């Protein structure tokens, strides 16, 4: 596989991979750096031109996931940084803030299963868990997220006056159904610079 073909392959999966890494690490720029580093390491693992991975989604997700956990082990706890604040409505802002309070293992499972919709088989393959273990951990993760979301104070960065904001009203309603707040976490846009940086790291001039 040539470097440009590898970049094109990563482009099929870059949006969910970036969205995952940014939310795992609590910031867009950290997410970008992690994604580039993980994909560059993947190219090295393929020995700079090996065959395409047999299961690309599983392979890329595992690469980025491992890189995120390595970064978290070095850095410690995360917070939902200001650059995530403009990526969604007031419900999404609150969901991001609640996710940031969770232990990484729980945040990981919620992002993979409830936000990005990995099916149970793929989730188990990526996390190296049995289906029973994954379901048990997801149950605990959802409960912890629910408690964190319900306990959050009213947002202070609403673009409207909170009394006039339908998203804030929805956020208050979801205090009783906090799992639904995760549905507000949409995909995060990948900047063109990310792909350019990956090409540079791989030595591809295209």
Residue ranges of model-derived segments:
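Short amphipathic helical patch at the helix-1/turn junction of helix-turn-helix
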Residues: 11, 113-115
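A short pre-motif secondary-structure segment
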Residues: 109-110
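A short, charge-rich alpha-helical start-of-domain segment used by transcription regulators
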Residues: 1-19, 29, 43
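Short amphipathic alpha-helical boundary/capping segments
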Residues: 94-103, 125
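Hydrophobic topogenic segments
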Residues: 153-206
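Σ70-family region 2.3-2.4 aromatic/basic alpha-helix that recognizes the −10 promoter
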Residues: 14, 22, 32-47, 52-89, ...
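DNA-recognition helix of helix-turn-helix
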Residues: 127-156
């Amino acid at each position: 596989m040539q470097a440009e073909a590898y970049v094109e392959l990563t482009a099929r999966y870059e949006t969910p991979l970036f969205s995952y890494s940014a939310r795992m690490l609590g910031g867009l720029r950290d997410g970008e750096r992690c994604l580039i580093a993980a994909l560059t390491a993947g190219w090295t693992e393929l020995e700079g031109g090996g065959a395409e991975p047999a299961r690309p989604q599983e392979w890329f997700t595992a690469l980025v996931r491992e890189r995120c956990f390595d970064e978290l082990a070095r850095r410690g706890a995360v917070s939902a940084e200001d650059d995530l604040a403009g990526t969604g409505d007031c419900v999404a802002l609150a969901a991001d803030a609640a996710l940031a309070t969770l232990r990484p293992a729980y945040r990981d499972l919620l992002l993979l299963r409830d936000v990005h919709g990995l099916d149970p088989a793929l989730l188990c393959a990526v996390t190296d868990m049995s289906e029973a273990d994954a379901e048990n951990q997801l149950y605990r993760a959802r409960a912890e997220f629910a408690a964190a979301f319900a306990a959050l104070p009213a947002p202070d960065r609403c673009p409207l006056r909170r009394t006039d904001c339908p998203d804030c009203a929805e956020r208050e309603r979801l205090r009783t159904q906090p799992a639904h707040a995760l549905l507000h976490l949409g995909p995060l846009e990948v900047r063109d610079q990310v792909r350019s940086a990956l090409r540079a790291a791989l030595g591809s001039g295209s």
